Design a protein with these regions (language model features):
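Intrinsically disordered, low-complexity regulatory segments
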Residues: 1-178, 265, 383
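Basic, low-complexity terminal or inter-domain segments flanking catalytic cores
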Residues: 2-5, 28, 93, 99, ...
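NTP-handling and nucleic-acid-processing catalytic cores
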Residues: 13-22, 40, 188, 194-231, ...
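OB-fold/S1-family RNA-binding modules
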Residues: 52, 97-102, 143, 242-268
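C-terminal or mid-to-C-terminal helical accessory/interaction module adjacent to the motor/catalytic core
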Residues: 74, 96, 139-234, 286, ...
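A conserved hydrophobic secondary-structure block that centers on an alpha-helix together
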Residues: 106, 311, 315-323
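Metal- or metallocofactor-binding catalytic centers and their adjacent structured scaffolds
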Residues: 255-301, 309
Length: 657
C-alpha cells in the first residue's frame, strides 16, 4: 500500500494536520514525511493565469486592434516567487509511492481553486483524491474532516465556479482596462498633469467605487430642510414629561401643505400659530388613550465575516482587512471556527454538540460565569429548534463561533485580537439567553381638536444583554424617565385631565446621508439587493452580494492602493478621491453596467449557480463572453473624449486645495 499525502494551503495549517495525525514525521525542505504519510503545503497561490503576451508576444503592446481578447484555451503558469515550493509539491503529488491525495486547502471556492491549479500544472492524473472540508482547526475537527473526506470529484462544480470567477475577472480586467486606458488615459493624464495613467476596472471593484462616489454626490447635492416641531411639557404631580404634537387623520393640519412631515412645519411662523392656538383656553389636556404592552428583543444572529468586520470597524476602528487578519489568526490558533463565512446560523450537526464549545469557555475568565450559567439553564439543549440553527442558510460554513479550545493561545494575543475574540464569544453565548423584555407605554392627549403623543420604554428583564453588552460600545442613556415614574403615569385613566406647563417650538433640520465607513461598506456589499427597486429582480438575486466574504476587504484595499478612494485610519470613513470620481465618470459614460450593483450581484449569483449545479459552466461562459465582447466593442466606438473633461470640471471644485 502506498503513501497518503495531505496538502494544505499554508505551512502553519500543514503543521496542525501533522500534529492531529500524530505523525512521527521528519522535516524536509517544503514538506514533512513519515513512514506512511506526507504533509506538504502551498503558500497561497502557486499558479496564476498568464498575461496576454504569453499567447502572442504582439499582445504585450496595448492596442484596440487586438481587443476583445478572449482565448479559446486559457494559459497558466507557476508564479516565479514560489516556483521552488511548486516544484516540491508537484514532485510529491506525482511520486509513484503516493496513491492517495487529501486536499486540505481552505474549505471554500478560493481554496478549491488553489489546489486545482496545482493539480492541473503538475499533471497529477488519476490518483485517488479526497477533499477534506473542515470548520475549525481543532484536532477533533481535522480528524473528522479526514475521516469523512469525500471524493474530490464531488467538488467539481465548485471548482468550475472558481475557474469561471478567475476567468471573468481576468477578461474584464484585461479588456476593459486596456480599452478604457487606450481611449481615456491621455485625457486624464493631461487633465490631472500626471506622468502616466492606467485605468483599472473590475467586475466588483468598479461597482464598489460607484457606490462610494454616488453616496458622496448625494451628500453634496443634499439641501438641508429646516422643520419646526411643537412639544408640550406635561406635569403630573410635580414631575414632567414631553408630549409631541402630530397631525393625524381628521385633525385640521392633516395632509396640510404647511407640513414637512406629520410632526413638523416648514415655516416657524406656522408652528408659532399652532402654539398660540394650543395655549388658548387653559393649559390642560385630556388623556384619550393609554396603552401598555411588553416588547421582546431576541438576541442577534451570530457573526458572519461581514457583521464582524462592521462591528470591529465601529468598536475598534480597524479596517475589514485587519479584522480578517485577526480572525484568521484566531482560527489558526484554534480559538474560533472558519472565518470566511456568509452564514449567521449553526448547522444541525454542530448544534447537537454545542455544549462542548460552551463548556470550553468556562476556562476563559471573562466568559466563564456566563458559560456556566448557560450550561445550568440547559437552553443549549433546545437551540436546534430556534432560528439560530438552519441548514438551508449554510453554503460552505456555519457562523463564526468560539471552538472552546486553544485557550493556551490567549496569552499571546494582541490587545485588539483579544477584544475581537471577546465580542465573538459574547455574540455566541447571547443566543442561549432569553430575549430582553421592555415595558412600553404610549399615551395620547387631546387639546381642543389637536393631539399630543408621548412614548416611554424601560427594561423589565435584561435577558441576553447580560452577556451581549460589552465594554467597548458607547453606552446609550435610556434614563430620562425612571421606571417608577413611567409606572405612575401608566396608572392614569382615560378621561383624566393633565396640566401643561408650556408649549415650545423645537427646531430641527433634515440630515444628509452618512458617508460609509469600512464596516458599513462591507455590509452594503453583502446586501446588494437594497439598490434594486424591481421587487422580482431583487428576489432573484437574494442571497447574492457584491463580491464574497473572502474578497470584500481586498476590494477596498485595492481601491485605496489605486488611489481611487481614501480610508481614514482613525475613523474608518471612506471617501472617493478626485481621481476616483474621474474614473467613475469615465465608466459611467462608457461601460455603465459595471457600476450597477444588480448586475454585479447577478454575476455572483450565477457563480453560486455554477457551484450548486443549477447553471452549467457553458451557460455562464457564453453570458460572460457576450458581455465582454459587447462592451469592449462599445468602448472602441466611443468618441466623447474631448467632451468628458466638462464632466470632470463639475467635480474639480470639491477638490481645490
Amino acid at each position: 500500500m502506498g503513501k497518503s499525502i495531505y496538502i494544505a494551503e499554508k505551512p502553519s495549517v500543514a503543521r496542525e494536520f501533522a500534529k492531529a495525525l500524530k505523525l512521527n514525521a521528519k522535516n524536509r525542505d517544503g514538506y514533512m514525511e513519515s513512514e506512511n504519510a506526507i504533509v506538504t503545503w502551498c503558500v497561497g497561490h502557486l499558479v496564476t493565469m498568464s498575461y496576454p503576451e504569453e499567447y502572442d508576444p504582439a499582445l504585450k503592446k496595448w492596442s484596440l486592434d487586438t481587443l476583445p481578447f478572449i482565448p479559446d484555451d486559457f494559459k497558466y503558469e507557476v508564479i516565479p516567487q514560489v516556483a521552488k515550493q511548486f516544484q516540491i509539491v508537484s514532485g510529491l503529488l506525482t511520486r509513484e509511492d503516493v496513491d492517495r491525495i487529501y486536499v486540505c486547502t481552505d474549505s471554500g471556492r478560493e481554496g478549491e481553486y488553489i489546489y486545482r491549479l496545482v493539480d492541473q500544472m503538475a499533471k497529477v492524473g488519476n490518483k485517488e483524491k479526497r477533499r477534506v472540508w473542515i470548520d475549525s482547526q481543532t484536532e477533533e475537527e481535522i480528524l473528522r474532516g479526514i475521516r469523512e473526506a469525500k471524493p474530490l470529484s464531488e467538488y467539481d462544480s465548485l471548482s468550475d465556479a472558481a475557474y469561471l470567477r478567475a476567468k471573468e475577472d481576468y477578461l474584464m480586467g484585461i479588456n476593459f482596462s486596456r480599452a478604457l486606458s487606450l481611449k481615456y488615459s491621455y485625457v486624464i493624464r493631461n487633465y490631472l498633469k500626471l506622468d502616466k495613467c492606467v485605468i483599472a476596472v473590475g467586475r466588483v471593484m468598479t461597482c464598489v467605487l460607484g457606490i462610494i462616489v454616488k453616496r458622496e454626490r448625494e451628500i453634496r447635492e443634499f439641501v438641508k430642510t429646516p422643520f419646526y416641531r411643537v412639544v408640550g411639557t406635561v406635569n403630573v404631580a410635580g414631575q414632567t414629561f414631553e408630549a409631541e404634537w402630530k397631525a393625524v387623520k381628521d385633525t385640521p393640519y392633516f395632509n396640510s401643505p404647511l407640513l414637512y412631515k406629520e410632526n413638523g412645519f416648514k415655516q416657524k411662523k406656522d408652528a408659532e400659530d399652532l402654539v398660540k392656538k394650543l395655549s388658548a383656553n387653559g393649559m390642560e389636556a385630556t388623556l384619550v388613550a393609554s396603552e401598555k404592552k411588553k416588547e421582546k428583543k431576541a438576541p442577534p444572529m451570530l457573526y458572519n465575516l461581514a457583521e464582524l468586520q462592521n462591528d470591529c470597524s465601529s468598536l475598534f476602528k480597524i479596517s475589514p482587512s485587519d479584522t480578517l487578519k485577526i480572525v484568521q489568526e484566531l482560527y489558526e490558533k484554534k480559538l474560533v471556527t472558519y472565518p470566511r463565512t456568509d452564514a449567521r446560523v449553526l448547522s444541525t450537526a454542530v448544534a447537537k454538540e454545542i455544549y462542548k464549545n460552551i463548556s470550553g469557555l468556562k476556562r476563559y475568565t471573562p466568559m466563564a460565569a456566563y458559560a456556566d450559567e448557560v450550561l445550568n439553564m440547559g437552553s443549549y439543549k433546545t437551540i436546534a429548534k430556534t432560528k439560530y440553527v438552519n441548514d438551508k442558510q449554510i453554503t460552505d460554513h456555519y457562523a463564526i463561533i468560539p471552538t472552546g479550545q486553544g485557550m493556551g493561545a490567549l496569552r499571546g494575543l494582541s490587545e485588539i485580537a483579544a477584544n475581537v475574540y471577546e465580542i465573538i464569544c459574547r455574540r455566541f453565548l447571547s443566543i442561549f439567553y432569553p430575549a430582553t423584555e421592555y415595558q412600553k407605554l404610549s399615551m395620547t392627549l387631546a387639546k381642543q381638536d389637536e393631539f399630543l403623543f408621548a412614548n416611554f420604554k424601560y427594561m423589565l428583564k435584561e435577558g441576553y444583554l447580560k452577556v451581549a453588552t460589552n465594554r467597548f460600545a458607547r453606552k446609550k442613556d435610556d434614563t430620562k424617565y425612571s421606571p417608577e415614574f413611567i409606572e405612575t403615569i401608566g396608572h392614569l385613566k382615560k378621561g383624566d385631565i393633565l396640566s401643561l406647563d408650556k408649549f415650545e417650538i423645537k427646531e430641527g433640520e433634515t440630515s444628509p446621508p452618512k458617508r460609509y465607513n469600512s464596516g458599513t461598506l462591507i455590509l452594503t456589499m453583502e446586501n446588494a439587493g437594497q439598490f434594486i427597486e424591481d421587487e422580482e429582480l431583487r428576489e432573484q438575486i437574494k442571497g447574492a452580494g457584491i463580491g464574497t466574504s473572502a474578497t470584500r476587504d481586498g476590494i477596498i484595499t485595492k481601491l485605496v492602493n489605486n488611489k481611487y478612494i481614501a480610508l481614514n485610519k482613525k475613523t474608518q470613513i471612506v471617501t472617493p478621491t478626485f481621481l476616483g470620481e474621474i474614473i467613475y465618470d469615465v465608466v459611467y459614460y462608457s461601460i455603465n453596467g459595471l457600476l450597477r450593483a444588480d448586475l454585479t450581484a447577478s454575476w455572483e449569483k450565477g457563480l453560486c449557480g455554477v457551484a450548486d449545479g443549477s447553471i452549467t459552466k457553458e451557460e455562464y461562459t457564453d453570458k460572460m463572453n457576450t458581455f465582454v465582447i459587447k462592451y469592449t466593442n462599445l468602448v472602441k466606438g466611443i468618441s466623447n473624449q474631448n467632451q468628458i473633461t466638462t464632466v470632470f470640471d463639475r467635480t474639480r471644485v470639491y477638490y481645490k486645495k
